[in-house]
Amino acid sequence: MLRGSCEAYRQQSEMEYYRRVLEALEHYFRENGWQKKFLNGGCFWLASILHQGIDGSVFMINRVEEHCALYFENGLYDIRGRISAKNFHPASEREISFMKKNYIPRFDVKKLEEYLVRKESLPLGESS
């Protein structure tokens, strides 16, 4: 019973971290269509931020769509929420290195990370 309760708490806190990050991003950008920033270049940055706060999460890549997402809590998540895992596979170290170099966010990463730590109190380490 205790093990099941701990697992449920851990999953709840993983999902809570995911929600906190998305809410913080919504507060930061405050513009229509802001989510597109994380579908066109910012997907690896988001997956990295989420990965820092979600133990056991796995970077996933879709080479067809050139998109990155994070697998945790038995599902695949990006800025849109839970998404289909079709055409995704766990990213190798080489693919992670590729994404770091080529999936370039179209926003000021340093400024956003400072906001997330200072204003939203998210426990971020180094993100890239």
Regions found by a protein language model. Give the residues of each.
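A structural boundary/capping signal
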Residues: M1-S128
